[in-house]
Amino acid sequence: MYKRQTDFCGVRSGKDIDKFKEMHLTPLPSKEISAPGIAESPVNIECKVREIKPLGSHTMFLADVVNVTVDDKFFDKKNTFHLNDTGLVTYSHGAYFLLGKKLGTFGYSVAKKKAKKRK
């Protein structure tokens, strides 16, 4: 989990400091864009900005995902992705959250009782 690095890189500008050097992170060449990914990250998502919307105190960037790289160690022999093992962090309304708790499976809200027991 890279909570401190995520916060630091989100708050500090790269104009005057090298965020990779400051946070002891390794740049990872991207496949579709010029900006590097982060080698230590379990998932890297490459995006191309489609639209920039000024919203007063903030700016919203709309982007298209053009490539996703996931570390192979988070897949089992059946090629199932194990999110719980990644330590992924998300940010919402000023707080960081650890991802991974399973809340349900696709179609659980309409599944018959017998099918629910199998999952």
What are these model-predicted stretches?
Residues 3-119:
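Basic, polyanion-binding surface patches
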